[in-house]
Structure formats: C-alpha cells, structure tokens
Amino acid sequence: MYFAIEGVIGVGKTTLARLLQPRLDTNLLLEVFEENPFLSNFYSDRARYAFQTQIFFLLSRYYQQNRNVPAMLEQNKHLISDYTFEKDALFASINLHGDELEMYYRVHEALAEKMIPPSLIVYLRASIDTLMQRITLRDRPYERNMERGYIAELNQAYDDFFLSNSRKTPVLVIDSNQLDFVHNSQDLDWIENRVRQVLQMAPFQPELPIDARSPEHAD
C-alpha cells in the first residue's frame, strides 16, 4: 500500500510523514527539493525562472519516484511519501504560460504514464494566514520572499485539484488549522486513526472521537 501526503507549501507534509512513518511501520519517501538551483531565484523573480524551476522539479520528481517507489513497494512494506508526482502539473499551471506550458504538459504526460499512483492521498488543508505563519516559523532562506498572493493562488489551486469529484484516487481531507500534530500527541493519534480507517489498517480505534476541530471527508 502506497499513500501520499499533499498540501500547500508550509502546511506540514514532511513533518507529518516523518511522524506517521514509525507509527505505521512504513517505508518513507521524502521529496528532495533543496537541490533545485533555480528555486531561490524563482521566489524572487517568478516570471524569469519559472520554466527552469518547473522542468527541474518535473525531472527530479520523475527520477525519484520512478526509481524509489517500485523498489520500496517490493520490500513488502507500506510506503508513505510527502508528495505526489501529479502535483507538479498543478504548479506548472500557475507558473507557466503559452508555449512553455504546452511544452511542459507534453513532457509531463509522457512521464506520468510510467508512475505508480498512490492508493490514498491525505490532503492537509490550512488557511492562508496559517500557511504564512508556518512558513515564517520554519524560516527557510529561499522562502523569505514568499508572496502572500502566491500562497493564496496555490491554496485555491490545491482545493480545486484535490477536492474534485472526478478524481480516481481517494482523498482524505484534513483541516489542519486547529491541529498541532507536532506537539499534541492526541492530534497525531487522531490523524493516524483516520488514515488507518481509510486504508483499513489494523489497529483502527473506532472509539477515537472525530470532533469538530478537523472536518474531513474522503472523495
């Protein structure tokens, strides 16, 4: 079983994947993104560096997943990842235009045919204010010039993409605004229990309350 955690920049995908990995006894595949030599410049000048940044990410994500996902699944363990290959096209639709976007889609379509899709996507949602606060707190140098408008645009695009009823892969939606799964073990327990329930992984605890703090659903 292979499932992935998705969400906008700063929502806590990697942190949650790291925390769930030992609890669910899975292999862990984390996105390597800091090696992108165009990323810092992209956040300072999106129009100029968008195409280089997107193509680098596309090929990097393809290489990582095409090599690692099949190998890890052959180990007879579940796999958790902090990203999906398909989300790369979501960023491209925002950052690229015209001939560059058309060229990108052609390459993406050819590569996507070789990808193994996850059995479940855990979509972490958060408000723009929450995302901006978390981005500020983690203080990555290349994110210090992050524009609020860009995060707002991404947030809407992620909702449109992952909440679509036409999706083939089931999506478990977690509203993370009021959750602190880093410092509050009950919040992490709650998320773990929901993942186990959807994936039908034992031990699922049906008595664990699903309260109004975190509305979610599976599409």
Please state what every model-predicted region is:
Residues 88-157:
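A glycine- and Lys/Arg-enriched "phosphate-lid" helix/loop adjacent to the NTP-binding pocket
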Residues 13:
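Conserved lysine of the Walker
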Residues 22-60:
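Conserved substrate/cofactor phosphate-moiety recognition/catalytic segment
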Residues 5:
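Hydrophobic anchor at the beta1->P-loop junction of P-loop NTPases
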Residues 16-17:
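Post-Walker A alpha-helix
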Residues 49, 53-116:
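Glycine-rich phosphate-binding loop used to anchor ATP phosphates in small-molecule kinases
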Residues 136-146, 150-219:
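NTP-dependent small-molecule kinase module
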Residues 8:
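P-loop (Walker A) phosphate-binding loop of NTP-binding proteins
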